[in-house]
Amino acid sequence: MDPKLLFLPRFQPVDLTPAWSQINLFEGIRFAFAIYSRDYSKPLLHFQKRWALAVLDLKENSPPIYILKQLAELLKNKVCYHPPMFVSQPDLARENDQHVFVYLSREKMQKVLKEQSITFGMEAVLATTIQPYRSELALQEMLRVHNLAWPHSRTEEPDLECFIAIFASSLFIHLLELKVTNVYGREVACTFFLRRGTENRPYDVVACGTTQFTKNALGISRPAASSPEPDLTLRLSGPDQEGEEGVMKPAAVNLKKEA
């Protein structure tokens, strides 16, 4: 049997463009990552193993087949975020899953979804742990940290309109840790990762949609110390809290009814 016929269709991104609130987007992203991990990655690894065994059984040892056999040895045990390719460094799953977000313009997002690739030419991919539902973060602050993290590629406001959610592969390197200040004056820690350009290469996108960063932070009054506004920051739950370790949980919010 032709080894390439043993592979599953690639994962179809969950479209979260209709998400109309912070909580809806939070839940949608969590659901999308869970679907990939629970319902897709396990059968994908099973099919990868079958493909790898078929390749390793080939009697031919020409240079292309030798490269495929090297790849097969890797794909036997690690989920790969793209189909088998003649590459020496595939995008493999990390030892511990790392959820990251790549921010981009609407036009660029449509291109990513159409071509099923996050890399174009030798352009680097900048990803961050800052989630797109963080409506307490100002667009201007997001621009500042993105340009601080990777000044080699200027980020403009349209580049933060949309997002794609992905698992960071083994080719994403830890770039730096930064802190962003939300509209209430609180600091929020974040991490940036960078993947160097490797020409156009397919990559599984988990979810996509539009961001909810605050566009007019100047119009938001900061809370008085004696009567703070509800903290809308979505925190990481610790081991002693309910829910899975490391899963983002929304803080309790008491909304006031309009008169």
UniProtKB/Swiss-Prot annotation:
Pfam families: RolB_RolC
Disulfide bonds, paired cysteine numbers: none
GO MF, one example: protein tyrosine phosphatase activity
EC number(s) recorded for this UniProt protein: 3.1.3.48
Entry keyword set: Hydrolase, Plasmid, Protein phosphatase
Reactions that this protein is recorded to catalyse: O-phospho-L-tyrosyl-[protein] + H2O = L-tyrosyl-[protein] + phosphate
Organism superkingdom: Bacteria
InterPro entries: Glycosidase
Role according to the record: Induces differentiation and growth of neoplastic roots (hairy roots). Seems to function as a tyrosine phosphatase.
This protein's name: Protein-tyrosine phosphatase RolB
Species assigned in the record: Rhizobium rhizogenes
Broadest EC class assigned to this enzyme: hydrolase
Region called Disordered, residue ranges: 219-259
